[in-house]
Curated annotation (Swiss-Prot):
Function: F(1)F(0) ATP synthase produces ATP from ADP in the presence of a proton or sodium gradient. F-type ATPases consist of two structural domains, F(1) containing the extramembraneous catalytic core and F(0) containing the membrane proton channel, linked together by a central stalk and a peripheral stalk. During catalysis, ATP synthesis in the catalytic domain of F(1) is coupled via a rotary mechanism of the central stalk subunits to proton translocation. Component of the F(0) channel, it forms part of the peripheral stalk, linking F(1) to F(0).
Organism (species): Listeria monocytogenes serovar 1/2a (strain ATCC BAA-679 / EGD-e)
Matches recorded under NCBIfam families: ATP_synt_b
Gene Ontology molecular function, alphabetical: proton-transporting ATP synthase activity, rotational mechanism
Claim: Cell membrane is one of the keywords in the record: yes
Membrane topology: Single-pass membrane protein
Protein name as annotated: ATP synthase subunit b
One Gene Ontology cellular component: plasma membrane
Amino acid sequence: MLQPHLVIGSAFTFGDAFFTLFAFAILLVLIRIYAWKPLMGIMKEREEHIGSEIDAAEENRAQSEKLLAEQKSVLQQARVESQTMIENAKQLGEKEREEIVKTARRESERIKEEAKSDIAREKEDAISALREQVGSLSVLIASKVIEKNLDEKEQSNLIQDYIERLGDDK
């Protein structure tokens, strides 16, 4: 048969409720000591780990942005420096070109002046030589004229003959 204390809907007793509450309180204390605190410690540790990972990621992102800005600055500076170097090289090349042209012009003027002075000297030498030859020829002709009395035709033939001899000597 049925036992009276196991029947559903049986009477509620204050002692059973107190014992149940006491057992539940002990269970809560035990759970808090052995499960809740370690679980909360693990959760706190996990929270701190995630927080430190987030902080590290933020710091890495900030460093990356800083490095990117520095690299952009260095790249821009390198571009400016290379442009300056190119401009300087162009200016230096232009100056050297102008200097080479000036030097070539001076050299050509010097050569031209040397050629003019050489021509003038050669001309003077030729004129001197011609004067000497004319002087010698005049003396020779004069001595021949003195030796014989020549008419105009003979005198002309004599001069022509000496001029031809002079041309043959050269």
